[in-house]
Regions:
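Short acidic/histidine-rich active-site segments
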Residues: 232-234, 288-290, 310-332
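C-terminal segment of N-terminal export signals and the immediately downstream linker at the start
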Residues: 31-56
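N-terminal export leaders
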Residues: 12-30
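Alpha-helical scaffold segments that flank or form the walls of functional sites
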Residues: 58, 65, 78-138, 142-158, ...
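N-terminal secretory signal peptides
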Residues: 1-12
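Active-site gating/metal-coordination segments in enzymes
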Residues: 133, 151-155, 159-230, 281-284, ...
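Distinct, well-ordered alpha-helical segments
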Residues: 147-150, 174-175, 210-215, 238-253, ...
């Protein structure tokens, strides 16, 4: 999960963020060609936890495609332990344990994700700063609570898209190992009918893909084909399984335009070979741990892709999971930090307002919009 540093050197004001997004009086100076306006299939919706929106109705601000507002209190403790165990497998004998791993450093406190008043305030601020919609990337095996997210959306006024699926091998329910692909597929269909799921995600691989993770990915691909619900993924750092994930989804018939391969800001490759391959195949590249100290090596990668003509395949978000980044604890951050901290760095590197508006406003709506195939059980 993300950590954060002081970003004040490039942080945008609320007015600057709203201007870039085409909101407020300052937006009049930012022309937008008709060819740049996204189009959506007839009957398409963005499914939020409270209702289905026509995608055009969420065009008044940025959409964050991967954040967290509902995780189990022990999620990061388990996350760190699994990471430490994975590193131990490849660690040379007698080598020191990496800093921050194991039981000596406590994980970030997630109790804020059970504080309705606090998160209501945080999301209301994010909305004022230009965020129109947020995708919660959790699901049951991460401790996501649908009822809690519904309360939070009602109290804050923020449209929230709920994720669905299964996370990664270490977090799978025990029965996944003995279930067939067909049984996993049926479980996903039950999720999609029982809950207002607007995306399958974050779903992924912990490191190199396991047999169970491949099985789950095939089932998720099939569930997408049966529902049209889009997919966003988690890749093991630094993106070892990115292309394999896309291969599996394509092999079962998924059109890549409905897929985001996530955490690719962690893949620091000046040649951007994997990033470009994903764009060329029609999927989105997710830079979704942004708005903090990991931004600097990511900005040149983003600019390389923009300069190569791939702006329409890029998505930004922050994978929010740290109380230190709350507005209450750091006035420079908050849930809008992708927009107010990372995006200004990309603009400073040479990206135009038009391109940034496309990435923050248009692309996520194009990704999330789908024509429902399955009627939900009410």
């Amino acid at each position: 999960m993300d950590m954060n540093a002081d970003p004040r050197a490039t942080k945008w004001t609320r007015r600057e963020a709203l201007s870039m997004l085409g909101m407020g009086a300052a937006a009049a100076a930012l022309p937008r060609g008709a060819s740049a306006v996204p189009s959506f299939p007839e009957g398409a919706v963005i499914r939020t936890i409270l209702k289905d929106y026509p995608p055009e109705e969420l065009g008044g601000g940025a959409t964050l495609f991967h954040e967290h507002m509902s995780l189990a209190p022990d999620f990061l403790l388990r996350f760190r332990q699994y990471a430490a165990d994975a590193q131990a497998v490849n660690r040379p004998p007698n080598a020191p344990q990496p800093a921050g791993q194991g039981g000596t450093v406590p994980p970030p406190d997630l109790s804020f994700m059970r504080d309705l008043g606090l998160l209501t305030e945080e999301l209301a601020i994010a909305k004022r700063e230009g965020i129109a919609c947020i995708v919660d990337g959790g699901h049951a095996d991460m401790g996501r609570d649908i009822g809690w997210l519904r309360q939070l959306s009602l109290s804050s006024g923020m449209p929230i898209v709920a994720g669905g699926g299964f996370y990664t091998q270490p977090f799978y329910p025990r029965e996944i190992g003995t279930m067939s692909e067909e049984q996993v597929f049926q479980a996903l269909m039950e999720q999609a009918q029982a809950d207002p799921i607007g995306a399958f995600g974050e779903v992924g691989s912990w490191d190199y893909m396991t047999k169970d993770e491949r099985k789950v990915f095939r089932a998720i691909g099939r569930a997408h084909l049966a529902t049209n619900i889009p997919i966003f993924t988690h890749t093991g750092i630094p993106g070892k399984s990115a292309l394999e994930q896309l291969d599996i989804l394509e092999d079962v018939g998924v059109d890549p335009k409905h897929v985001v391969i996530g955490h690719l800001g962690n893949l620091v490759d000046p040649n951007t070979e994997v990033h470009r391959a994903i764009c060329q195949r029609g999927a989105f590249v997710g830079f979704d741990r942004q708005g903090g100290p990991n931004d600097d090596p990511v900005v040149p990668i983003v600019m390389s892709l923009i300069d190569a003509g791939y702006a329409d395949h890029l998505l930004f978000s922050s994978d929010f999971s740290n109380a230190s980044a709350l507005k209450r604890n750091n006035k420079e951050l908050g849930y809008a930090k992708t927009l107010t901290v990372f995006v200004p760095k990309v603009k400073k590197a040479g990206a135009s307002d038009e391109v940034l508006r496309q990435i923050m406003n248009d692309n996520p709506r194009r990704f999330l919009a789908f024509v429902p195939k399955v009627k939900r059980k009410v």
